[in-house]
Amino acid sequence: MTMPQTDGVEFASRNNLENGDGDQVRSQWVAIERSPTCKRITTALFCKRDEQGKRSQRRVMDVSKLEDLDRRLFIDELIRHVEDDNRVLLQKIRTRTDEVGIDLPKIEVRFSDLFVEAECEVVHGKPIPTLWNAIASKLSRFTFSKQEDKISILKGVSGIIRPKRMTLLLGPPGCGKTTLLLALSGRLDPSLKTRGEVSYNGHLFSEFVPEKTSSYVSQNDLHIPELSVRETLDFSGCFQGAGSRLEMMKEISRREKLKGIVPDPDIDAYMKAASIEGSKTNLQTDYILKILGLTICADTRVGDASRPGISGGQKRRLTTGEMIVGPIKTLFMDEISNGLDSSTTFQILSCLQQFARLSEGTILVSLLQPAPETFELFDDLILMGEGKIIYHGPRDFICSFFEDCGFKCPQRKSVAEFLQEVISRKDQEQYWCHRDKPYCYVSIDSFIEKFKKSDLGLQLQDELSKTYDKSQTQKDGLCIRKYSLSNWDMFKACSRREFLLMKRNSFVYVFKSGLLIFIGSIAMTVYLRTGSTRDSLHANYLLGSLFFSLIKLLADGLPELTLTVSRIAVFCKQKELYFYPAWAYAIPSAILKIPISFLESFLWTMLTYYVIGYSPEAGRFIRQVLILFALHLSCISMFRAIGAVFRDFDVATTIGSISIVLLSVFGGFIVRKPSMPSWLEWGFWLSPLSYAEIGLTSNEFFAPMWRKMTSENRTLGEQVLDARGLNFGNQSYWNAFGALIGFTLFFNTVFALALTFLKTSQRSRVIVSHDKNTQSSEKDSKIASHSKNALPFEPLTFTFQDVQYFIETPQGKKLQLLSDVTGAFKPGVLTALMGVSGAGKTTLLDVLSGRKTRGDIKGQIEVGGYVKVQDTFSRVSGYCEQFDIHSPNLTVQESLKYSAWLRLPCNISSETKSAIVNEVLETIELEEIKDSLVGVPGISGVTAEQRKRLTIAVELVSNPSIIFMDEPTTGLDARAAAIVMRAVKNIAETGRTVVCTIHQPSIDIFEAFDELILMKNGGKIIYYGPLGQHSSKVIEYFMSIPGVPKLKENSNPATWILDITSKSSEDKLGVDLAHIYEESTLFKENKMVIEQTRCTSLGSERLILSSRYAQTSWEQFKACLWKQHLSYWRNPSYNLTRIIFMCFTCMLCGILFLQKAKEINNQQDLFNVFGSMFTVVLFSGINNCSTVIFCVATERNVFYRERFSRMYNPWAYSLAQVLVEIPYSLFQSIIYVIIVYPMVGYHWSVYKVFWSFYSIFCSLLIFNYFGMLLVVVTPNVHIAFTLRSSFYAIVNLFAGYVMPKPNIPRWWIWMYYLSPTSWVLNGLLTSQYGDMEKEILAFGEKKKVSAFLEDYFGYRYDSLALVAVVLIAFPILLASLFAFFIGKLNFQKK
């Protein structure tokens, strides 16, 4: 490879300092040399530049204090053309170190006889996690009946990854590539059984810290969505530190001073800036942004599924950049090219190759579909299959090895594709080269034996048998420190990030505070001047107001739980990388929430204190603020600890709800301490709410205004406290405050310990390939024979002219993403849509298909010669999205069956639909996994490439006339991509219109297309026309442009096209390819052809469908209910946890209120019974509402996809979602009756039992449906949870428990009637005691129970019929609102 040209790059050369400003540089350098070492290594001669690129005079500067603009402009000038100038930069750095005689540290990785095994559970039948299976699995832990087996992932692999060389890791999915990368980087899951030896420079993992010596780039993109790309890289670079750069810079500086060498000022400035540790921002970040092509989105937030952000390809590059921004030189990289075009992949790997060769790096990269040019960048190659290494040696010799085995790679065939297919039983025969000998399948074990006997194999075994020569020099590259920064620097960096995340989530905190002010305003007017009357009755109301304040602030901490769980995955990744210890993450999380806790406590007290009428002394006001502040702080600490311990949304939410129940029930208000069983009194002392209750009540009732003496020779305040069991003396306030601070410290300690010691949750399961070689029969996919079930369809032409698309930027400006795009997609023609990353390919597909939910679209789009009608178009088209969105709890076959059921016309029989489903399963080679659960990406279920094939299959079964496919081969290996594209080609040959965006096509895949639309950045077309035989037409077009380099023989034309049309190539040529196309004859011909196509299409009948949906409303509902039933039944984490929670709550109430309902002698007995009802209703409802939010939110993105495809009316979906909840709520209600009814001692009669069952059943439905409604009216679960907390506060306040109906001010009585809990509690209490005529002692006077209910609570027995109607009306209303809003609102931003 020739050295690149460096014209135009303004490097100051040491050998040329005499020219220009040489004397000035020397004199300035002398000043730097006189500085102390600590200052000299951060001081350089830096040339400032302005935004126009104009340079000022060089001056001595501290490079640790460079501004953002200085760093960006410096890197822009240093690296103008990435591939060329990066080599020059690294070469100059290497020359500088060589001149002073410094050897760069290097690492050789050896592994010998490495075995990795995983334990798996053996189940009978389908291993699908249903409710029964989950219960059986839990029970098997106690019965020891669980059967386990072992799966071998790696089977005795050995090899050497050498420095200065870049090694490619190839193999089919499931062969063990990821496990090998994890094993070599020291990141294997401890639960896996490992045998064998891995060493770095002869040192075992126990002698150093492998996580800090090597980097593993995961294939899962896991980032904090609120951070920008630059902030993500800066944070990673800060914690990875400078490694050996700092010491090396000191040594270079010392030796240069001794030799009198004046270094290149730019290189010196770069090296010194890159060696700075612990800085908030770093020049290395700008360098990584440049070489990865992320400069354009550097200040864009990463985003996620619910928040706009960077593209999938950019996210993939960010994952790579996050690992290589540090000083680590041993890199293990897992499928880093997913979602990237071949040109970008080539550019990134070229830079990595230069790094390996010039900086002594050791790099092992696994790729799925490397283009020939990318393939040739590698020095060595490891080919794997079935957990074994087939070949390990120089890349140049692998073809000759397989030729010796009898297999030859054809011309114009990518070697990487050949290697992955030649080891496959299905594809091997086509490469047999000994035509004079009969072909016989050569197994992987046979290949391995032949390699071991070859010269390369013998040489490898010989090297591995020799003991590595350890020396101190070779150990310099090994890191023995876990963390790169000091404790203080780690704390500061984590605090900076936490504060930034709080700023980015400021809307949530402001919104939460706004809701708190709203609820506080309601509460203060409900309890208006309650404290102005001093008697036992009003004291009871005042206690209710204090309890409500505590419950509100307790529930206000719940959003902290969801926030903790949502960030735990990123924390675990960074902890495993030894970015920082758990305490550095935990302490800022706790400390920075203190001001928020204080603010919310102060706001609440300021609103309510004097309006309600508490003791007016200023000191008591401050003490109430302090108690509420301490409670709020302890509660958010508790929820944070729960999130860290359990880490699963459903489980953590359920545990959070259980915690609220325990804290509330043992808090001293719902159940008085004297009324608790003696053996459960410890619960009172373990509840933070108890101490808050003690603190607030002692602060209030020991005030002067409550010192009125009663007949019992006690103050009124003491009498009130004694009645509640809260009289612990005046000094108890500070004891309570201290206890709450102690709880805060305890929960934060638990939080830190959980983060430190608990295993990473939700780690992806190990996927191993099935041994297809042992199958008795081979199922060969004969694509040509798949026409037996072909269905009639209408061939359609799709034309678009002068399409433009604009979006509005945050600054209020319009940004154009598509510019005058014109083209046509014709029946039977397979069209490729190509371009560099960010060119607008996906944007164009989204605009043409009508999927954009924002922005301004201009231009003409026609289907069949008529203006596109979206309802009709959605029915006749299919869209395979880039991101594979599916229901996680269906199997692969059920996903296809569901799609066929709803999208194929209703006149097609069920047998035909099933045949089509089976045919597509066979065509896309999904038959072997048809009974596998789809699962959640990266956590469970099918692999990424199987998920991609499922996405395509789901669209194929719908028999569309037009199919849009966005990156259908992304994430697939070469063989799987070929399978998919054969199926796609076959579809196009049936006369359908097929369009695919594609990033890294092989020669075979690329030339399977008939036409090509090529785009450049800015959404402009630079070529639209036929490919021609062997891509001759498109090659001829670009070769006609002066200066375009020729295509090398047997090279991939797709890679060549992307390379010559990149931005850097355009700049070199000095042309605008879009303008050249618009001025070309081809463009004029295309315009004529498009017009002719339109005119021809106009002669056909307009496509009119009889209905908006393929199926009747009844069929839609049946299909949706079938799917929802399966999804719920197979979701034990949702249903089992809420059932367990119901059992727990009922048992707790049964124990605490044991037989309390049998004897009612005074108002307190009635209050106890009412408390048990309140506890079950409110807290079981809270848990149901919380858990259903995650369940519905998981399916919402799937719903958006299915709704766009016009699979069903939203009413059919919502009705099924509503009805599927009923059996589970029914079961929970039965649990209540079975446990609570006999334990509490309610009256046994059919009427009363039914009323209890009916009231609880309606209550559960109300909370379930309200949770579902919250999901569809909010953009994400964090907002939903914040609104949910306010809903709890309102239904608690107006339930009639803390403030009975007769005492609610008339201006708020309408809220009482709107609160569902008030009707539920009315039904429960009135049905039990509304007809009781027994006299009791109530507040010093005798009253009948029925009269007391009417006077105190406002409950009348003769109103039960109205209560029954209202109770069923609430769930119907909420379900209707859910159905309405799910059809109207769409928070998916496209």
Curated annotation (Swiss-Prot):
Domain ABC transporter, chain residue ranges per copy: 137-411, 798-1043
Protein name per Swiss-Prot or TrEMBL: ABC transporter G family member 43
Family: Belongs to the ABC transporter superfamily. ABCG family. PDR (TC 3.A.1.205) subfamily.
One cellular component term from this protein's GO annotations in UniProt: plasma membrane
Keyword tags: ATP-binding, Membrane, Nucleotide-binding, Repeat, Transmembrane, Transmembrane helix, Transport
Gene (name only): ABCG43
Matches recorded under SMART domains: AAA
Natural source organism: Arabidopsis thaliana (Mouse-ear cress)
UniProt-annotated binding residues for ATP 1: G171, P172, P173, G174, C175, G176, K177, T178
